[in-house]
Amino acid sequence: MNYKELISERLSSIIELPIEDIEKLIEIPPKPEMGDFAFPCFQLAKTFRKAPNMIAEELKDKFDKSNFEKVENLGPYLNFFVDKSIFSKNVIEKILEEKDKYGASNEGKGRKALIEYSSPNIAKPFHVGHLFSTAIGNALYKIFTFEGYDCERLNHLGDWGTQFGKLIAAYKRWVDEEALEKEPIKELLRIYVKFHDEAEKDPALEEEGRLHFKRLEDGEEEEVKLWKKFRELSLKEFEKVYHMLNVEFDSYAGESFYGDKMDAVVEEIDEKGLLVESNGAKVVMLEDYNMPPCIIKKSDGATIYATRDLATAIYRKKTYDFYKSIYVVGLEQSLHFKQVFTTLKLMGHDWADDCTHIGFGLVRFTDRKLSTRKGEVIFLEDLLKESVDKTLEIINEKNSELENKEETAKKIGIGAVIFTYLKNNRERDIVFSWDEMLSFDGETGPYVQYSYARGKSILRKSGEIQGDVDYSKLNSKEEFELVKTLEGFNKSILQAIEKLEPSIVTRYVIEVAKAFNKFYNHNSILNAEDEEIKKARIKLVESTCQVIKNALNLLGIEVVEKM
């Protein structure tokens, strides 16, 4: 039984409003003593020509109270107190019946969603900043898929641009082939940094780089061969990191893929009378939208990012006919995407409204900053390995007898990093702290994973439960608060979709872990006062583990069975 639906149906028969409209108005009161659900009567005042508190009183008298402990009116609110044993039975049985599917729905059935994320630059380090986009995009993919959407995971590789001319010039002068074979990205970064250092002393190098890029654009064999080599070596390295993170993609079509699709876009913009000349460049004027012009071609005739992103969006609409296209790219690109989407609208592509840029903040280390040109960069692979090593140290200190220590350290260490990136609103910067991130107390990945492992330990000791379970035995405050928290899983997922904010699911699973540990600390489970209470509590533990597992899976984090 879904109490929200039940309340909506019964109210609908009294006030003749559509069930779905009523359901949207139902709230969860801030305090348990105010009930489990509340219906505000403000919106009915106009229709009924009465004060909201009078409407609430009349509704209370007419409402069918079966399956409810009580229904009260408090000022303009109608407050509902559910029958705790019916509620607990419904929630726990639903979780244990649906298992890995609990929280899922058909919300997105028949709808195509594209999610572009990660998108690192070829021949440059996959650094800690890239994990923001990767973690958010991967979580959104899992969340959308869980709710029935047909999703495509797109990795828009930065595999084109003038930097490749510089890299080819650097390669021909300074590459160490042995080092390139061993650690490709580090060697490519070394020669790229060297190019910039040397170019400061000898500006002719910049011209050499431009020449190589021109030859690459013209399809000259040597340059194309080297560019392909850089791309393949980089992808191999990126895939190592993706494997560590359990992240996959459906497409790696990057900037180079859209190179031959831009002329048609420039032509279309011109045909629609949108292309004007400004300081020698070809632009689309956007002053009516309080934005600077969208540059389509620079004064030297070269196209830029905006042209490529316009071509990309048009190609994706033709190829996938998406319902929603999401770009997970840093906040600093906000204006760029506003310009691109506005230009698409001016071109007559109304589906531009279905394109959304979701930004994210920066990653800050108390003692280190990120910069590619000078080579001072924290490689993500190194950071993940360091997290796993530090976790292994903690395990050896706390439980050296644990089986599969290395595998467990990997799940906890990598999970802790992902959890940190997804814990707060995505637009907030992250200040990185090892002590905080790897703590088994507080709002961390290890705390949630430990809560799951604690639950699984109880279930291993209890064995299989035989016979019917009497859920009316779950009558402590902590038990009911935990059941209510478990019931809210689907709501948190749908909110995450609406706001494109995975942290809503992260915050939710923290609340589940907190409610579970509160229940665990206040109630004896394996040594409960009688067998019926024990059975009901074990089922509550089992359903809690299932919800934690489902939620962590949506965030791209694995559970740990033993700690």
From Swiss-Prot:
Its main location: cytoplasm. It holds the Pfam family Arg_tRNA_synt_N. GO terms for biological process: arginyl-tRNA aminoacylation. It is found in: Cytoplasm. Its EC number is 6.1.1.19. It catalyses: tRNA(Arg) + L-arginine + ATP = L-arginyl-tRNA(Arg) + AMP + diphosphate. Keywords: Aminoacyl-tRNA synthetase, ATP-binding, Cytoplasm, Ligase, Nucleotide-binding, Protein biosynthesis. One of its GO terms (cellular component) is cytoplasm. InterPro entries: aa-tRNA-synth_I_CS (IPR001412), Arg-tRNA-ligase (IPR001278), Arg-tRNA-synth_N (IPR005148), Arg-tRNA-synth_N_sf (IPR036695), ArgRS_core (IPR035684), DALR_anticod-bd (IPR008909), Rossmann-like_a/b/a_fold (IPR014729), tRNAsynth_Ia_anticodon-bd (IPR009080). GO terms for molecular function: arginine-tRNA ligase activity; ATP binding. A motif ('HIGH' region) lies at residues 120-130. Belongs to the class-I aminoacyl-tRNA synthetase family. Monomer. This is Arginine--tRNA ligase. The gene is argS.
